[in-house]
Amino acid sequence: MAAPKAEGEDKPKRVRKSRAKPKPETKEVKKPKSKEFCTADDSSDDYNEVKPSPAMIALMAVKEIPESEDVPDKSDSEAEAPVPAIVKKRRTPPKKAESSDDKKLDEATGEQVIDEDALSKLTIQTLKGMCKTRNLKISGNKAALVQRLIEADGIAHIIPTTATVVQKVKKTKRPAVFSKVDSELKLIPCPGREHMLMDEATGLVFLDEDPSTAVGFIEHGEVFGLDSEHMTVCKNMGIRYSWTEDYLC
């Protein structure tokens, strides 16, 4: 008679499985041998699977080129090719287009000519500034200022300024006649002037009541006030000189 089983013996026992992963089965792959080291024992399949190396491809390409054909050397052509020089171009400023509003210059004197059209395009403040430089009045509207400048410009071309007169006097040389004049005057009655005397050598004119003071000079029968040349003659000869409009009337 069988012995009774203890409690818990009738239950199946648990079997612990190992966590190690099974190793995959690897097949041995035969490496193809190169063409140079293949022997007669090697199979034909292994020989067909051999691929040429890059060195062998280059060697085969060189053998295919005929000897008579000239192959240009890249190194020589690259060495002989000149390197283009970089040239920087200078930037030239754009030329200003000549407009009709540009300042007009007198061909004879080289001075600016005042144009009425050009003045009318200027502002009142600019016109007043131009009037100030010419010692003109700055009162009035734009038309009055333009007219004033035009009139002043016309007078300036007829009557030279003081600076121009002084410059001409400095450059004027003394005539040879004045350098040879004696210090002694030979006064004779002035033709057409009963109350005046004149010296033929210098052309100086004196009053009959004061023959020591020159008041003008005579030229082509007309009496004029003393100019810079005749004043210089008076200084060199030690003659007093004076000029008043009352003497010449």
From Swiss-Prot:
PROSITE patterns: SAP. It comes from Frog virus 3 (isolate Goorha). SUPFAM superfamilies: SAP domain. Residues 1-110 are annotated as: Disordered. Residues 119-153 form the SAP domain. Gene3D superfamilies: SAP domain. This is Putative SAP domain-containing protein 049L. Residues 1-12, 22-38, 95-107 have a biased composition (Basic and acidic residues). It comes from the Viruses.
